[in-house]
Amino acid sequence: MDAEITITELTPDLVPAVVGLCERALDLAEDAAEAAAIVDVLWPRAAADRQVVGLGARRGADLVGVLLCSVSPTDPGVGHVDLVAVLPDERRRGVGRALLARAEAVLAERGVSEVLLAGNPPYYAWPGIDVRYTPAVCAALALGYRQDRTAWNMTADLSYDASLALRSTEAAERRLAERGITVRRAEPADLPALTAFARATFGGTWDGEVAGSVGRTGAGCHLAERDGELLGFAAYGSSRPSWFGPMGTAPAAEGSGIGGVLLRRCLRDQRAAGLDRAQIGWVGPVPFYSGSAGARIERVFFLYRRTLPAA
């Protein structure tokens, strides 16, 4: 007879074991390939500014499933399930259900009244559940979660020199220079101004994502400025090396062509790092990315929520 499943809290020394399990349990090759980055952003990095709990499911001595959850840094009554991964041969055996039930209890102990199966920016690996992880969608519905939003990524093809995503920006940069606008790579010394600009102009958590893009391996940021005044930025790699974003242009500079230049500078960096495609994450302006980089909608995510029963 199979050993029973036990759920225990994970300790930081188990990060390598969690990465190894995710490499085997994440069905989509692009996710499995970035398992180390995914675990890093959702656990050690996220724990720097929020409560994060890791749970492991064991059958006997074997780790067969993991869950990472966190409390919203802006609303302590909201918790997020950031990752659930179960080995293929352990699915449909109650492992995911047991992990999620324990996560709800752990989050409730921390004052959470509503749980989201959705990204918790600025430290997230997906906006929600990729629809191709169909068993996870079915499990969410069976456990009483309701879908309340849909999000999508766009894919930029970096696999060949003539890709629209890799078009030269030299002529556009010359035109901008004639107007006194400089475009360059951001450096760590730029972070105070960049994060203040992102926070004041766009709000949300973009300041945190920009901070996670500068001075880190596999990440980067480019900016546009005039007379020391920031006009826009584009970043990549904050959540995952293959993901682009966020990007923002000051309202006064919209229509200047800054956005397309910054975007393609980042995409060229990603190609130089060996990527043959980039994910433009949690996209808003679909027509802009389609026109500027030939990007297409590809990954689609369902975001779920559930109000926990009163104690």
Give residue ranges: language-model regions:
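Acyl-donor-binding surface of acyltransferase catalytic domains
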Residues: M1, A101-A177, F301-T307
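Short amphipathic alpha-helix that is part of the acyltransferase structural core
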Residues: M1-W43, R50, G54-R58, L63, ...
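A conserved beta-strand-loop-helix scaffold within acyl/acetyltransferase catalytic domains
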Residues: D27-G54, R59, G65-P76, F202-P251
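A structural microfeature
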Residues: G65, R149-W152, G232, R299
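A conserved beta-turn-beta hairpin within the catalytic core of GNAT-like acetyltransferases
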Residues: V71-D82, R91, R110-S113, G237-G245, ...
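A short, internal acetyl-CoA/4′-phosphopantetheine-binding micro-motif in the GNAT/acyltransferase core
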Residues: V81-R91, N120-Y123, M247-G255, G284
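Conserved acetyl-CoA-binding loop-helix of GNAT-fold acetyltransferases
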Residues: R92-E109, T249, G255-R268, G291
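Short hairpin/turn module used for nucleic-acid contact or packing/dimerization
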Residues: G255, G260-A311
